[in-house]
Amino acid sequence: MSTLRKTLKDNRWACWLVLACLVVPMFASYFFDDMFSSLSELFKNPEYLELGWNMADYGFYASGYSFLCIWGGLIVCGALLDRFGVRLVGSIFVGLMVGGAGLVTFAISAGFEPKTSLTIAYIGCMLFGLGSEIAGVSVTRSIAKWFKGRNMALAMGLQLAIARFGTATAILIAPMIVKQKALGEFYTLAETNKPALIGLAVLAVGAILWAVFVAMVGWLD
């Protein structure tokens, strides 16, 4: 059994399988983060949104992504990652990323008053942002370990390219999901929350693949 594990760990195809498991959570993270960027015009007329947010509200919500990161969250969590390893800490923060996205989706779907939904969504965005950034560090560290001495730069480049494709996908398909209406027509929550629901579903797939990665690494180690 130990010989089989060593053979798989040294097999270059195992490395690419690991990469395949790692890139999906990052793709999903970038997609969810940018899902409203091409829909920002909607917030210019909050009176036509059941959500009720204006441009300032949307800007406030989006700023939540960086709040915990710039106040030492990345440093503290990076130290925890060094201390306890990718499998434990990375899993916690992938979970935090998905949980934060779930809280955002709940906030913009439940029919709260605008200020209440904004507050809940902001908290969710803070958790999502910190989870996403530490998950990204975990992915980079895992790639460095698995591709040590072989195709490391290529693997990191592919990971980043696929993650950025999440941004491009969000920008391209969000206007198709929430179709623009004539000025004066009303947008319901069921319409404006569609990008978040899709993003949350992709994040859930990413979390499952992260779990596959953790299980595989645990077995091979």
Question: Where are the model-predicted features located?
Answer:
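Extracytoplasmic
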Residues: 17-45, 53-55
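Small-residue-rich segments within alpha-helical transmembrane domains of MFS-like 12-TM solute carriers
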Residues: 30, 34, 129-137, 168
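Central cavity-lining transmembrane alpha-helices of secondary-active solute carriers
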Residues: 63-79
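C-terminal ends and interior cores of transmembrane alpha-helices
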Residues: 95-114
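Cytoplasmic helix-loop-helix junction between adjacent transmembrane helices
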Residues: 124-161
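Glycine-rich segments within core transmembrane alpha-helices of 12-TM secondary carriers
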Residues: 153-179
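Symmetry-related core transmembrane helices of the 12-TM Major Facilitator Superfamily/SLC fold
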Residues: 193-214
